[in-house]
Amino acid sequence: MSAKTAPPQAALLRSALPRPPLPRNVKILAAVSFLTDVASEITYPLLPLFLSTVLGVSAAGLGLIEGFAESASSLMRLPAGWWSDRTRRRKPLVVLGYTIAALARPLIGVAQSAGQVLLIRVSDRFGKGIRTAPRDALIADSVAADQRGYAFGIHRASDNLGAVLGPLIAWGVLTLGLAELRTLFLWTALPGILSVLLLVFFVRETHGPAATEQRLASAAMPKSETDANGPPLAVLDVASAVPLGAPFWRLLAVIFLFSLSLSTDAFLLLRASQLGVSNALIPILWAALHVVKASSSAVGGGLSDRVGRRPLILGGWGIYALVYLGFAAASAPWHAWALFLVYGLYFGMSEGPEKALVADLAPPSRRGAAFGWFNAAVGIAALPASILFGVVWDRWGAETAFTMGAAIAGVSSVLFALVVPVPAARAVREGQV
């Protein structure tokens, strides 16, 4: 057997074996995301209704609030990721971010103006910005390279299962008259606090497979690059130690362009209402979307470990473009139901593989910073994406706005296929092929 044929045969052998169980960190972080999304998705599908009917906010105003909220989170994503690399401590930032969101989110229940909702949403997303990159880096650190897609897929599936249960709780509470809207928002403090307790008591800084990669890389460094006690300077000053590389930056540029099509999903809920879906069924529609997201996320992430990230991401982005074209042409309530279900496949096929590809392209010592840049790019794009979509909707109609989003997604898909490389060299080093 030649050296050239050994790696592919080894990959085939690994793919035929049962998957090893995921480590506790991944499972607990998945549970935390489940609880957080239960709380978040009780609120989110009802927020457009609350803003438009209770506070009288227009489509452009909705886009402004959600755009600022998502972009505000980007202010902390990069420095949080960088700091978690610098200190090699992910958990404190993850706990802080989830705590801020858990405390801020219920306050929507006492908001009396659009400005107050904006402040609350910005605080909520600011917490998300603090936690996201360190959490993703912690997941990547906790598993071997050939389990990354699966780990991120399971994490996204748990997140989406929470997003199924949250709207169902909201629908049940409101339908049965157990509480009015503002009281329901206040109740979201309960799952938020429970998620923080899980983090504090059960998640540990990792010393797993990816940490071993970093120790091996550090051991290979010249003695002149270590301090008197032995730790490599790369661990202490990762920002200047290892470049992220051109392939990573090309991926980031294309993801930023695609993210300009990612206006807030609140517009999809408004479009569904416009097409005739009743307010009582909006939470059920939102839950149905997340059933598809949850079931497809675990499959999509794991499949990307076997067939590669590129086919899954391209397929997901293509579905996104087609769904937006569908919303532009839709004219009946059942169109909204069908499009929401197909829309769930986009998330399942692309979210986990995108994050796994970021981890593939980033050196182990820079994963926190890499996820910081990735999440910052998506967050920064959210503001112009949502504001532009809302303005186009108000001036030229929903059909034009959705067509614009589909066009941006289509162009981004073509660019992804042309300029984003398959990370073959690093995949071989980490045992992926």
At which residue positions do the language-model features occur?
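Structural signature of the two symmetry-related core transmembrane helices
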Residues: P92-P106, A189, P311-G326, A406
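Helix-to-loop junctions at the C-terminal end of transmembrane segments
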Residues: M76-R88, L174, S296-R309, W393-D394
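Helix-loop boundary and gating motifs at the non-cytosolic
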Residues: A16-S74, F248-L285
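Juxtamembrane intracellular "pre-TM" segments in multi-pass secondary transporters
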Residues: S2-P23, E205-I255, V433
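Intracellular juxtamembrane helix-capping segments at the cytosolic ends
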Residues: I130-V143, M349-A362
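Helix-loop junctions at membrane interfaces in 12-TM secondary transporters
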Residues: L107-I120, A328-L339
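Transmembrane alpha-helix termini and helix-breaking/packing motifs in multi-pass membrane transporters
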Residues: L49-V54, L165-F185, P384-T400
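C-terminal membrane-cytosol helix-exit motif in multi-pass small-molecule transporters
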Residues: L190-Q214, S412-V420
